[in-house]
Amino acid sequence: MNMDIEARVKKVITSCIAVDVDSINGQTHLVEDLYADSLDLIDIVFGLSEEFDISCNENDLPDMTTFADICRVVKKSLESRV
């Protein structure tokens, strides 16, 4: 995975949820590990849309349960723009 994408995704997550950036790794689960609630998840989706200028909405949430999942969705969205 692109390290720039990972760093930017971490930035979005930590701006929406009060967690330490070092506590996030590929298998970090948003709900189980970071205790994100539904509003946090929506904030993350909209934050990703703004950060990466991609079309991302709450319909993408089922595919975005872990940090690695989020990075994959973002990367796929960025690649489809090209």
UniProtKB/Swiss-Prot annotation:
Keyword Cytoplasm: yes
Function: Acyl carrier protein.
Name of the protein in question: Probable acyl carrier protein IacP
Keywords (A to Z) from UniProt: Cytoplasm, Phosphopantetheine, Phosphoprotein
GO MF assignments: acyl binding; acyl carrier activity
Modified residues (O-(pantetheine 4'-phosphoryl)serine): S38
InterPro entries according to UniProt: ACP, ACP-like_sf, PP-bd_ACP
One GO term (biological process): lipid A biosynthetic process
Location within or outside the cell: Cytoplasm
UniProt modification remark: 4'-phosphopantetheine is transferred from CoA to a specific serine of apo-IacP.
Main location: cytoplasm
NCBIfam families per record: PRK08172.1
UniProt domain Carrier: residue ranges: 3-78
GO CC annotation terms, alphabetical: cytosol; membrane
